[in-house]
Amino acid sequence: MVGLDARSTMDIDATVKGATVGIEEVENMIASIISVPVDDGVEFRVKRISEIMDEAEYPGIRISMETEFDGVITPLKTDISTGDAITPREVRYSFKLMLEDRSIEIWAYNLETVLAEKLETVVSRATTNTRMRDFYDLHILSQLHGQSIIPADLRAALIATARKRGTEKYLADAPAAFDEVEADPNMKNLWRAYQKKFSYAADLSWHTVMDSIRSLYELARE
């Protein structure tokens, strides 16, 4: 939705519907996928498969792999979960390939669910959320795709996500949480560190980011 020029990532997040997500099942699934012959010169190797334990609201399986193309080895991490509250439903997304002049279609989260998951995290975690990429993503997605957001779907997705994570009680106090987050010295320092690390955020003020997040929340209340 954003593109590599706005924020790059070496990770893939996926959710599975209608299947068990355990280490053995995922190992078999990944082995089947990477063994498909496509003759593109890319080789995938699984290095490690483990349960995700670091973030309670994102239980699932993490696959650490490396890819090799033309002698260059690149690490790749894939997180697979199940039971995410995709609201109202997943959508087909056309993804343009980097090395071929064609696109492929994938099932993806709708924009409103992507925003809802990140917005819920900002509200419920408040000043304990150290993932500045969540804040940046909310801002850039609202700037690039704001006209495409359906308020009713955003509201439904936010409620569904909070219900699944057991954080509905925090939604009513979101404005106060936003004020606390914006004023917190540690959060400001984290944002400055993020700006120094990632040039795409260098000219983006903390206040501007938080204003975008407030606007998204108000849109969800329409």
PLM regions and their residue ranges:
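Structured mid-to-C-terminal alpha-helical surface segments
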Residues: 2-6, 12, 17-222
